[in-house]
Swiss-Prot record:
Gene: secF
The protein's name: Protein translocase subunit SecF
Example of a GO cellular component annotation carried by this entry: plasma membrane
Subunit and interaction comment: Forms a complex with SecD. Part of the essential Sec protein translocation apparatus which comprises SecA, SecYEG and auxiliary proteins SecDF. Other proteins may also be involved.
Coiled coil: none
Keywords from the UniProt entry: Cell membrane, Membrane, Protein transport, Translocation, Transmembrane, Transmembrane helix, Transport
Taxonomy of the source species: Bacteria, Bacillati, Chloroflexota, Chloroflexia, Candidatus Thermobaculales
Pfam families linked: Sec_GG, SecD_SecF_C
Membrane topology annotation: Multi-pass membrane protein
Transmembrane segments: 11-31, 135-155, 166-186, 197-217, 244-266, 276-298
Subcellular location, record wording: Cell membrane
Similarity comment: family membership: Belongs to the SecD/SecF family. SecF subfamily.
Functional note: Part of the Sec protein translocase complex. Interacts with the SecYEG preprotein conducting channel. SecDF uses the proton motive force (PMF) to complete protein translocation after the ATP-dependent function of SecA.
Species per Swiss-Prot/TrEMBL record: Thermobaculum terrenum (strain ATCC BAA-798 / CCMEE 7001 / YNP1)
InterPro entries named in the record: SecD/SecF_arch_bac, SecD/SecF_bac, SecD/SecF_CS, SecD_SecF_C, SecF_bac
PANTHER family noted in UniProt: PROTEIN TRANSLOCASE SUBUNIT SECF, PROTEIN-EXPORT MEMBRANE PROTEIN SEC
Length: 317
């Protein structure tokens, strides 16, 4: 029989190796906030003829938008003049729909690059952006507290029910840090922004992670009643092996669906789907190799043992 519990420190180490780089980027550079959080205008258009992104930036700079963020989307082609594309996304200071500022920009773009089709035009004020950001933080915090309370109540008949809730929250935070950390890296190097859909993805990842964790915890609870006399380590290991295939199969079904959405869906939901993909993979891993194994470490007082072992060594030096 495979002994998953025996390798728990290796799984903890792997989690740290994944989380630490993203956390460093998050602390040093933060997330690249979209207009939903900072305010501004997101404008996505598709020209009839291919254009160079550098030329679009130059046109916007001439109109007074020197700090505009411009990037391509969709198919690109290489020509003698450089890389060209028909799809252009622009992040600008707040511009109202049907305003003189927008009319001026439309005239500049059409006179220089020809006709285009407007795909998306979204404008959010700074005050609304701050409100969305604050509400997003509150939503995630309330979801975490609700999960902790529910798990503690659901497992109230086992010993130390709050341990189950706390370990589930730790696994959930693991998944959130993985997603947020990767998006901090993508934001720094590829200009990927987060918006309200990103918060929706995080809440979905939290729900999936906790759901998967509860399935494993519930099997541990059942086996504690059925396998009276066996050690907690043995019960957890058996429970993990019994739920492993089910967890992986469920996750793979979701992952294949998300992959189809990522490659064949619209550009506006790509980052949302990417966040879900990362979160589902991380949630599957953490529910199997983190949450339940943390219960074992807590039961065995593993971390106290490590601290006690390091204290004499520190005193000897």
């Amino acid at each position: 029989m495979i002994d998953i519990v025996r390798w728990r420190y290796a799984f903890y180490l792997l989690s740290l190796l994944i989380i630490i780089p993203g956390t460093i980027y998050l602390l040093l550079f933060g997330l690249r906030l979209g207009i939903d959080f900072e305010g501004g205008t997101f404008w996505q258009i598709q020209f009839e003829k291919p254009v160079r992104i550098e030329d679009v930036r130059s046109a916007l700079a001439q109109a007074g938008y020197n700090e505009a963020f411009v990037q391509s989307f969709g198919q690109q082609s290489n020509t003698a003049q450089g890389t060209v594309t028909r799809g252009v996304s622009m992040r600008l200071p707040e511009i109202k729909e049907n305003s003189p500022e927008k009319a001026k920009l439309e005239q500049i773009l059409k006179s220089r690059f020809g006709n285009y089709e407007e795909l998306v035009f979204t404008s959010v004020g700074p005050a609304v952006g701050r409100e969305i950001r604050n509400r997003s933080i509150v939503a995630i915090a309330l979801a975490s507290l609700g999960i902790l309370g529910y798990i503690a109540f659901a497992f109230r008949k086992v010993s130390h029910p709050f341990r189950y809730g706390i370990c589930a929250i730790i696994a959930m935070l693991h998944d959130v840090l993985v997603v947020v950390g990767i998006f901090a890296i993508l934001g720094k190097h590829f200009g990927v922004e987060i918006d309200a859909l990103f918060v929706t993805a995080l809440l979905t990842v939290i729900g999936f992670s906790v759901h998967d964790t509860i399935v494993v915890f519930d099997r541990i609870r059942e086996n504690q009643l059925r396998r009276y006399g066996e050690s907690f380590e043995q019960i957890v290991n058996i429970s993990l092996l019994q739920t492993l295939v089910r967890s992986v199969n469920t996750s793979m079904t979701v992952i294949f669906t998300l992959l189809a959405l990522y490659f064949f869906g619209g550009t506006t939901i790509k980052h949302f789907v990417l966040a879900l993909l990362i979160g589902i993979v991380s949630g599957t891993y953490s529910s199997i190799f983190n949450a339940s194994l943390l219960l074992v470490s807590w039961e065995n007082k593993d971390f106290l043992r490590i601290f006690r072992r390091t204290e004499p060594e520190a005193a000897a030096t």
